């Protein structure tokens, strides 16, 4: 779904720790000393850290016992026997295949370390769940048997021409939000009503493409593990293995164009995942482009745009008063200095304080208003459902035993977003890292689309426009100088309707989508399918 507010504020972590303490019976709080490795590592780094960062980590050490309950824990699960699956693809078998090149040299048919991976596949009966009857579906798990990681996926074939239509991987953000929220809340073939009934979605992205929805990293949605993944780079090799084994099992899709799409924290994921795929010479993944919606990709350039978006300069009325806006301005210099230090070292020891300070000083004032951080036009009625009560309905439907059985699910329960994963990534310094630095190398090989609903605060269109204009790459000047043009519907009965603005140069495209919040397909389903279809057909690239 979205960039989780759980990890956004320094006060959020502290509040959670305090709440944990309050809920304990009086006198039951256990005083646990911080692990000695924490003291030793901090001592090694103290000489190189500025005073403010050293003070931050000293406080963390003092309160370390409060943060331990916040780290994600493994899920209860029962692994089904391989004989219960329709297909099992062994990574070791794929890795063992060698072929002879045109000049007689031998090389592996498919690159990558695949030996520890398996892919389990179940053919899902559409009639059993009532979702997209007549459309071929598969679900299952990618297993990394070496590290006990199991990623859940759900594949929907194109409604139109699956033999020729492209294949798209969809990733939600968080970090820690299930891509099944994107399936049922945004762009999948169906939604769930309050009576737990299936409602078909005429604007599903599988109208003209086959779509894979993936729960990642581990312990998100229906995925599980005895260990954890706490940074974006660590997840990249899993994605490569999943796609490689999936296309090996289903070669009919491997020859078609493949695209990676996602939103929010996928602004971190996608540059890394695409770079991992493109780093392999011999592969069965035909990657043609990437699409990032309302993403967090370059914090140093995006964070200065929070104040303008909250204070009336983003096309919507101001949410904050002038005094609060001035306070955000006063905090910005310190915030940017911390992010610059993070960019220089990429060490958690400086990246964590940068995220904690900036999220508290720059994003915190907005959250305190009670407005929806994902849509400046509305209040947040229920923060426990991330301001979208529909998530509760989706979660209830997916937790039905009949649904889990039909999908081959191996965990005991489903939750839409895992706050523990969010905090894991935050406290490992992943939040503020400069993943935008990977984009120039992507642009050398494939087109990149950055789109943004213009009513979102948390990954707002101003910040996304700013970082795309600022990105250093050979086509920088032409892109930055390109004018924004009207984006209009051309594909259906709404032909001529203005849905946003677009600018494009070389392999780089930016879109502003009018009247949409953080989740563009939710607020503007017709507009989202319009630009999605046209992008896949090659327009603007």
UniProtKB/Swiss-Prot annotation:
It comes from the Eukaryota. Keywords: Carboxypeptidase, Disulfide bond, Glycoprotein, Hydrolase, Protease, Signal, Vacuole, Zymogen. The keyword Transmembrane does not apply. Glycans are attached at residues 208, 507. One of its GO terms (cellular component) is fungal-type vacuole. Vacuolar carboxypeptidase involved in degradation of small peptides. Digests preferentially peptides containing an aliphatic or hydrophobic residue in P1' position, as well as methionine, leucine or phenylalanine in P1 position of ester substrate. This is Carboxypeptidase Y homolog A. It comes from Arthroderma otae (strain ATCC MYA-4605 / CBS 113480) (Microsporum canis). The lineage of its organism: Eukaryota, Fungi, Dikarya, Ascomycota, Pezizomycotina.
């Amino acid at each position: 779904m979205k960039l989780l507010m759980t990890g956004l504020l320094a006060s959020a972590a502290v509040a959670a720790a305090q709440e944990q303490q309050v809920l304990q019976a009086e006198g039951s709080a256990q005083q646990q000393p911080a692990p000695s490795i924490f003291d030793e590592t901090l001592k090694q780094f103290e000489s190189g850290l500025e005073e403010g960062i050293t003070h931050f980590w000293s406080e963390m050490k003092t309160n370390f016992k409060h943060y331990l309950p916040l780290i994600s824990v493994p899920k209860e699960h029962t692994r089904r026997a391989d004989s219960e699956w329709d297909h099992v693809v062994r990574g070791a078998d794929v890795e063992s295949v060698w072929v002879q090149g045109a000049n007689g040299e031998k090389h592996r048919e498919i690159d990558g370390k695949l030996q520890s991976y398996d892919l389990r596949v179940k053919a899902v009966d559409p009639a059993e769940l009532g979702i997209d009857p007549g459309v071929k579906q598969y679900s299952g798990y990618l297993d990394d048997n070496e590290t006990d990681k199991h990623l859940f996926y759900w594949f929907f074939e194109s409604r139109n021409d699956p033999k020729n239509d492209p294949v798209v991987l969809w990733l939600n953000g968080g970090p820690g939000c299930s891509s099944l929220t994107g399936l049922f809340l945004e762009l999948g073939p169906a939604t769930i009503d309050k009576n737990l009934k299936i409602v078909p979605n005429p604007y599903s992205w599988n109208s003209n493409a086959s779509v894979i929805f993936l729960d990642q990293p581990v312990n998100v949605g229906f995925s599980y593990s005895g260990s954890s993944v706490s940074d974006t780079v660590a997840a990249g090799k899993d994605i490569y293995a999943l796609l490689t084994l999936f296309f090996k099992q289903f070669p009919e899709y491997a020859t078609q164009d493949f695209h990676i799409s996602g939103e929010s924290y996928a602004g971190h994921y996608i540059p890394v995942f695409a770079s991992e795929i493109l780093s392999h010479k011999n592969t069965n993944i035909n990657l043609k482009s990437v699409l990032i919606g309302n993403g967090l990709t370059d914090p140093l350039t995006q964070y200065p745009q929070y104040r303008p978006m909250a204070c009336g300069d983003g096309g919507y009325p101001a949410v904050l008063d002038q005094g609060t806006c001035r306070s955000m301005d006063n905090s910005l210099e310190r915030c940017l200095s911390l992010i610059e230090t993070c960019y220089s070292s990429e060490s958690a020891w400086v990246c964590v304080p940068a995220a904690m300070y900036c999220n508290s000083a720059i994003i915190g004032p907005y959250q305190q208003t009670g407005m929806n951080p994902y849509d400046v036009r509305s209040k947040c009625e229920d923060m426990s459902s991330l301001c979208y009560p529909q998530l509760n309905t989706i979660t209830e439907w997916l937790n039905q035993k009949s649904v889990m059985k039909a999908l081959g699910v191996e965990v005991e329960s489903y939750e839409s977003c895992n706050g523990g994963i969010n905090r894991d990534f935050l406290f490992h310094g992943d939040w503020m890292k400069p993943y935008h630095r990977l984009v120039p190398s992507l642009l050398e090989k494939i087109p990149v689309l950055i789109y943004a609903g213009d009513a979102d605060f948390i990954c707002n269109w101003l910040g996304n426009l700013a970082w795309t204009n600022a990105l250093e790459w050979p086509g920088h000047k032409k892109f930055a100088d390109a004018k924004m043009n009207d984006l209009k519907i051309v594909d259906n009965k709404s032909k001529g309707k203005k849905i946003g603005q677009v600018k494009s140069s070389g392999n780089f495209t930016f879109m502003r989508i009018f009247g949409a919040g953080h989740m563009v397909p939710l607020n503007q389903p017709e507009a989202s399918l319009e630009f999605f279809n046209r992008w896949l057909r090659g327009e603007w690239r």
